[in-house]
A protein has these predicted regions:
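Selective transmembrane helix interface/packing segments
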Residues: 1-246
Length: 246
């Protein structure tokens, strides 16, 4: 396993690889949306068609969960979530940056003891291949869905925990607690496992692992797209359960 550079700030430790990957993912999404939405016209061209297709696709996700007026409020959120996770998932398939450390780097948390295990330092990977990122995103969606439900109808929010029977309260609580855990673990496990296998195949002899490597990279692109879709759908499901009319 490659070493991960870390920095300490205000008593907290930050993973440099994750910060680079997350910032790059966000910048790529920003740049893509900026380029695809320049010079909009009534008769859309190629770039505008691509953006409109993506918006229609995500609008279909929100429309499945909420009424038309309500779903429009969450379109920007769902679009941003889908694009960020999609780009973050695919970055590790396309780009993995590692370097060789020739000596300890205390400022990045790399010690001589670490170098005895390996001298390979990871500088870039998919942010979603780290469980801390997926837990943070799933946790934020979990908290927001509850706050949105309370803000819309405090009494209705509390009543759903005892429906259809009061003795189902513990079951509802377990269900709510398990949602962010499964939401985060599903995304992380799929992306992490894919990157680990890519690293293993990359270290092998090209004559034996070359074809399996390219085949798995192609499959990883498919998995990355599917997982971005699933994460966004589940996010909207959890929010719709709290703010939906039914």
């Amino acid at each position: 396993m490659d070493l991960t550079p870390k920095v300490k700030f205000l008593g907290m430790t930050f993973d440099v690889t994750l910060m680079i990957g997350s910032v790059v993912s966000a910048l790529i999404v920003l740049l893509l949306v900026f380029l695809l939405t320049r010079k909009l016209s009534v008769r859309p061209g190629g770039r505008q068609n691509v953006m409109e297709y993506v918006i229609d696709f995500v609008s279909g996700i929100t429309g499945m969960m909420l009424e038309k007026k309500e779903s429009a409020r969450y379109l920007s959120f769902a679009l941003t979530t889908f694009l960020f996770i999609l780009v973050a998932n695919l970055l590790g398939v396309v780009v993995m940056v590692t370097a060789t450390a020739h000596g300890p780097i205390p400022s990045l948390g790399i010690t001589a003891a670490d170098l005895k295990l390996t001298d390979s330092v990871s500088w870039f990977k998919s942010p979603t291949s780290d469980i801390n990122v997926t837990v943070a995103m799933a946790g934020a969606i979990f908290l927001y869905s509850h706050f949105a439900g309370i803000a819309k109808s405090p009494l209705g929010y509390l009543q759903h925990y005892v429906k259809p029977f009061w003795w189902m309260l513990p079951i509802h609580i377990i269900d709510e607690v398990s949602k962010p855990a499964t939401h985060a673990l599903r995304l992380w496990a799929n992306i992490f496992a894919g990157e680990v296998l890519i690293l293993i195949l990359r270290e092998g002899t090209f004559y034996f692992t070359g074809i399996p490597l390219f085949a798995w990279m192609g499959f990883s692109v498919f998995v990355g797209c599917i997982q971005a879709y699933i994460f966004t759908v589940l996010a909207m499901v959890y929010i719709a359960q709290k703010v939906g009319e039914e």
